[in-house]
Regions:
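Gly/Pro-rich cap/lid or specificity-loop segments adjacent to the active site
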Residues: 1-168
Length: 168
């Protein structure tokens, strides 16, 4: 169990949270492994529909689990009868996050910023060629399967709409 919340949103949402371990390179199942951060917000009704709502974040780069409390009010009616499933795509949130910048970096000049961004890939604990929309949507389908859902509904905004189209 976990509680999803944001300082700027009044909602505190109870969820079931966990991780799914997947290979960073899907072609090498016994290679380097990464964790996908997952939260399932169970339907309010005891007679939930069998097809949950998977919510996809914008960005790319947003953590859906982190921002969900802010968008929950628009999904409240659907939540009455459907589980809501949140998966931080690889490289976002707590799913092997890809971060090079920190709060102090906002004070860098242009040359320093360019140098920092150019050195970023070598500093990351990731092989970036496996952090694509196609692979992230294969991860999403693996989450669907592991959770036992045969069909799902997708909801995305901004980049999440592109990700949803890739999934379909």
């Amino acid at each position: 169990r976990c509680t999803l919340s944001l300082p700027s949103a009044p909602n505190q949402i109870d969820a079931k949270c966990g991780t799914l371990i997947v290979p960073e390179n899907p072609s090498i199942p016994d290679g380097r492994l990464i964790n996908l951060n997952i939260a399932v917000v169970p339907a309010i009704s005891r007679k939930a529909e069998p097809d949950p709502l998977f919510v996809l974040a914008g960005g790319p780069g947003q953590s859906i689990i982190e921002i969900f409390p802010a968008i929950y009010p628009i999904l409240f009616k659907l939540h009455q009868t459907r589980d809501i499933v949140l998966v931080d795509q690889r490289g976002t949130g707590q799913s092997n996050p890809l971060h090079c910048l920190n709060a102090n970096d906002k004070f860098l000049n242009n040359d320093e910023t360019i140098a920092l961004l150019q050195s970023c890939p070598e500093k990351l604990d990731a092989d970036l060629k496996y952090y694509t929309t196609d692979i992230a949507m294969k991860d999403l389908d693996q989450v669907r399967s592991v959770l036992g859902y045969s069909t799902i509904n997708l909801y995305g905004t901004s980049y999440g709409t592109r990700a949803a189209l890739t999934y379909l």
